[in-house]
Amino acid sequence: MQDQEEERMITNQPKEEDLILENGLRPKFLVDYIGQNSVKERLKIFIEAAKQRQEPLDHVLLYGPPGLGKTTLANIIANEMNVNIKITSGPAIERPGDLAAILTNLAANDVLFIDEIHRLNRTVEEVLYPAMEDFALDIIIGKGPSARSIRLDLSQFTLIGATTRAGQLSSPLRDRFGVICKLELYNNKQLTAIVKRSARILDAYIDDEGATEIASRSRGTPRIANRLLRRVRDYAQVKSDGRITKRVAEEALILLEVDSLGLDNTDKKMIETMIYNFNGGPVGLDTLAATTGEERNTIEDVYEPYLLQMGFINRTPRGRIVMQKAYEHFNIPSAE
């Protein structure tokens, strides 16, 4: 099922092409970053205060669904602070020694960005506690009764952690972040602005209606908006005169099997499973995962945020239920 998810045009998980091309489309400073206004305003104040005191920014936790700009914000913070950034991920730091090597190579006030920080193993996480709190590493020398601990001072730094699953962070780790920001799904106006900005960078002509059409099918996610823009640009180049209008965008997105709300056949399968197998719910997450063949985390991180925002499903203490709006969109008669 992982391969199936990677093939989806509207997945919010990064594809290899996204990772290559996103760097060119990413804004470099807060003034160019579209959306997340509350988060931006807070970060602007905290960054300016840290610069005035000539101190590192307090540790930052960014959380929310994939594709909303957590990595972009981390790079922007480093740029605004005029410091270097080291980028890694929770799964990549397998041993305490791996983390120690990274920390000891940071210069004063540098940013360490750990994506998927909820996937750090516990032994690595415990090394991080004194590093975050005291800018120090506690190293154990020797074994058994003769073992002793020495403390190694580190340069002051800012840790930025990113996660799609803030609830999986341990309390000791979460409590050490001084700045915690939740990123929300984008509205169509914000996504339209992102599509138009990206089109300018890609040197692609797009009119307002064409940009709005792509934005409306992007599931509230900039990563998806930029991916759809690139595919619509391909279609416009081969099947039209290269100009992205509403008509061209509609034709391209029909070909890509992305409907007017940004839903595809996988979303339809998820909704139909809940309706036909479980009478519209409630259905437990584990049961839904087993029935659809999708992983539990994939359902929670990839499908649910947008379906919830659209009012197609609802979460209850007893499980997920399908809402009337989903029946209407997919032309399925609702149960009497």
Swiss-Prot record:
<feature type="binding site">
    <location>
        <position position="71"/>
    </location>
    <ligand>
        <name>ATP</name>
    </ligand>
</feature>
<feature type="binding site">
    <location>
        <position position="70"/>
    </location>
    <ligand>
        <name>ATP</name>
    </ligand>
</feature>
<dbReference type="GO" id="GO:0016887">
    <property type="term" value="F:ATP hydrolysis activity"/>
</dbReference>
<feature type="binding site">
    <location>
        <position position="296"/>
    </location>
    <ligand>
        <name>DNA</name>
    </ligand>
</feature>
<dbReference type="GO" id="GO:0009378">
    <property type="term" value="F:four-way junction helicase activity"/>
</dbReference>
<comment type="subunit">
    <text>Homohexamer. Forms an RuvA(8)-RuvB(12)-Holliday junction (HJ) complex. HJ DNA is sandwiched between 2 RuvA tetramers; dsDNA enters through RuvA and exits via RuvB. An RuvB hexamer assembles on each DNA strand where it exits the tetramer. Each RuvB hexamer is contacted by two RuvA subunits (via domain III) on 2 adjacent RuvB subunits; this complex drives branch migration. In the full resolvosome a probable DNA-RuvA(4)-RuvB(12)-RuvC(2) complex forms which resolves the HJ.</text>
</comment>
<dbReference type="InterPro" id="IPR004605">
    <property type="entry name" value="DNA_helicase_Holl-junc_RuvB"/>
</dbReference>
<keyword id="KW-0963">Cytoplasm</keyword>
<dbReference type="GO" id="GO:0006281">
    <property type="term" value="P:DNA repair"/>
</dbReference>
<dbReference type="Pfam" id="PF17864">
    <property type="entry name" value="AAA_lid_4"/>
</dbReference>
<keyword id="KW-0238">DNA-binding</keyword>
<dbReference type="GO" id="GO:0005737">
    <property type="term" value="C:cytoplasm"/>
</dbReference>
<feature type="binding site">
    <location>
        <position position="320"/>
    </location>
    <ligand>
        <name>DNA</name>
    </ligand>
</feature>
<dbReference type="InterPro" id="IPR008824">
    <property type="entry name" value="RuvB-like_N"/>
</dbReference>
<feature type="region of interest" description="Head domain (RuvB-H)">
    <location>
        <begin position="260"/>
        <end position="336"/>
    </location>
</feature>
<keyword id="KW-0227">DNA damage</keyword>
<dbReference type="InterPro" id="IPR008823">
    <property type="entry name" value="RuvB_C"/>
</dbReference>
<dbReference type="InterPro" id="IPR036388">
    <property type="entry name" value="WH-like_DNA-bd_sf"/>
</dbReference>
<dbReference type="GO" id="GO:0005524">
    <property type="term" value="F:ATP binding"/>
</dbReference>
<keyword id="KW-0233">DNA recombination</keyword>
<feature type="binding site">
    <location>
        <position position="26"/>
    </location>
    <ligand>
        <name>ATP</name>
    </ligand>
</feature>
<comment type="similarity">
    <text>Belongs to the RuvB family.</text>
</comment>
<dbReference type="InterPro" id="IPR027417">
    <property type="entry name" value="P-loop_NTPase"/>
</dbReference>
<keyword id="KW-0067">ATP-binding</keyword>
<keyword id="KW-0547">Nucleotide-binding</keyword>
<dbReference type="Pfam" id="PF05496">
    <property type="entry name" value="RuvB_N"/>
</dbReference>
<protein>
    <recommendedName>
        <fullName>Holliday junction branch migration complex subunit RuvB</fullName>
        <ecNumber>3.6.4.-</ecNumber>
    </recommendedName>
</protein>
<comment type="function">
    <text>The RuvA-RuvB-RuvC complex processes Holliday junction (HJ) DNA during genetic recombination and DNA repair, while the RuvA-RuvB complex plays an important role in the rescue of blocked DNA replication forks via replication fork reversal (RFR). RuvA specifically binds to HJ cruciform DNA, conferring on it an open structure. The RuvB hexamer acts as an ATP-dependent pump, pulling dsDNA into and through the RuvAB complex. RuvB forms 2 homohexamers on either side of HJ DNA bound by 1 or 2 RuvA tetramers; 4 subunits per hexamer contact DNA at a time.</text>
</comment>
<dbReference type="Pfam" id="PF05491">
    <property type="entry name" value="RuvB_C"/>
</dbReference>
<dbReference type="InterPro" id="IPR036390">
    <property type="entry name" value="WH_DNA-bd_sf"/>
</dbReference>
<feature type="binding site">
    <location>
        <position position="186"/>
    </location>
    <ligand>
        <name>ATP</name>
    </ligand>
</feature>
<dbReference type="InterPro" id="IPR041445">
    <property type="entry name" value="AAA_lid_4"/>
</dbReference>
<keyword id="KW-0378">Hydrolase</keyword>
<feature type="binding site">
    <location>
        <position position="176"/>
    </location>
    <ligand>
        <name>ATP</name>
    </ligand>
</feature>
<dbReference type="InterPro" id="IPR003593">
    <property type="entry name" value="AAA+_ATPase"/>
</dbReference>
<feature type="binding site">
    <location>
        <position position="223"/>
    </location>
    <ligand>
        <name>ATP</name>
    </ligand>
</feature>
<feature type="region of interest" description="Large ATPase domain (RuvB-L)">
    <location>
        <begin position="2"/>
        <end position="186"/>
    </location>
</feature>
<dbReference type="GO" id="GO:0048476">
    <property type="term" value="C:Holliday junction resolvase complex"/>
</dbReference>
<feature type="binding site">
    <location>
        <position position="72"/>
    </location>
    <ligand>
        <name>ATP</name>
    </ligand>
</feature>
<keyword id="KW-0234">DNA repair</keyword>
<dbReference type="GO" id="GO:0006310">
    <property type="term" value="P:DNA recombination"/>
</dbReference>
<feature type="binding site">
    <location>
        <begin position="133"/>
        <end position="135"/>
    </location>
    <ligand>
        <name>ATP</name>
    </ligand>
</feature>
